[in-house]
């Protein structure tokens, strides 16, 4: 019995790996009793109801917190593997997947590693080494801190490495003068958007360098010139332990934010086929040169204007987007990883044989992979990563509970999710918790299908989500025309270009928020009244006014003075600045949400817990009504960890500039001062943060300059409740009588009806 031990790389990876290995197990042995899957899990993962825990045969609980305590801890991984008597360990991506110490330690205990050997990982997994080796193979490399350095073999001397590596901000400044701006600061051991910063000036370099250090502690750092107007193309390579290497076409992963992919697709359509062949051949040559074994990815930058390309890096592991390649080739990559670790040559793997057009998929005849033709791509696959990020705030990571997740499968659509209903995304997790793939004959058709699939996907909870933003990106003309670059999405974010639902205006959002708050308050007051009466205490007078609620809501820095009156359990009247604005009919849903009929449209509204305001989801779109801001307090916008202060204690902070840095889901982010004045540190670096926690107190320099929410003035859009449809063949007098009778009953029940004077007419 073989026992792989998948480690949650992020958890969505473990879910995918388990399913792929189970599929191979049944295809090969027609049973589910061959593989016994054991997973590591933290208490945070258990509380988050991580899906991979349910799929595994067993799990072993390890320490929570930073990945240094668990999934990046080589000693712990080996200890767990030995404890469960594992035959193999699947490392996924991230964490310890690119640490050569892991395969070395596992080999010492005769445990297979489903990845490359330590020597080949050393050779190409380190980004600095990979660039030097690429230069040595006459592969074009864009200018960087190690330009011109070459070696004869695959072993890179320490002094050569030192010449390419930067050990301080001062060394980075000297190298930047040679490389030129704009440039990238990179951690050699980084990946997945971690340990990388784009800078345009020396001042930005001085800020970005320590941020890269903090995201990937202990990693060597280098700089690289930024390639403009480029596409991010990558080649999937597979190599066995017998010297055979093949490429499985390429992928285009050019839609990125913070240098982390968000939409992937394949095969490559932006470059001519002859260019793609050169990329694939170069990837195979590099893998052969270093004696690579396992599954890996060779990445390139392709200039869409000139048609030139240059080497970027090698990822010596499976990547998040590998199902794109699986879809267009029919090759199960986690299963291939397992077979490579078992010593099986590529020509004896059924999926590889099918890909090379061999009629006998279970045969063992040799294949000349250098000359044998491959099957053409099986259509086009496009994928979108589902992340717990807030697109309205530059894709800031968020964490919290997930109350609802529904994914409707369509023909040609698949989805992998690391959590389900009653799950969540904790602060130490990766922000990605889902991946949706659409497969059709052409790129255009795949894009349409992915957009439709995202429209059918619903996620509701304490987290923010990128689903609607993803769908808007796919529908943009630049993307549909295949004319975007790696800088496209970051440019949209910088320009605050957000998808706009023209039917969901600010006034409609305020009305939905007002109805939800009034509905919630009604039941809160009702509970207090019942509790008081149960205890034999007369309720206070303010508790008994269940049908009228006065409050303010702030949206987009505008403050709305609202008065909401209930005419019945299902009818709400809203006044803005004491002027009638809305009549809304409400249906309470089984999951606690409301269906609000407003201005001829039905909106599904859910409220989510928040310490700093009212958060609602309107048709899946998160909308936030913050509490009034206190200019003397600077607070945490979400969960995370305080890393360091950028402004000293009892020093002056300038509004609009960073005053500290926090770590949110493995990403370093600045907090921006909301007032100008002398700040007092209230927390020590390393402190855990929750939403609303006060980080600094501020002695405001000029109270008159404090930005406050402006009261709403002007004319508010008028909304009416839904109108009856269909045929009512009743006497008009009888209808009027029934309506009046219903209104009287509601008034006697304690409800109010602002429309009494117009509703009740003589007949």
Where are these regions (language model features)?
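Structured functional modules or segments
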Residues: 629-720
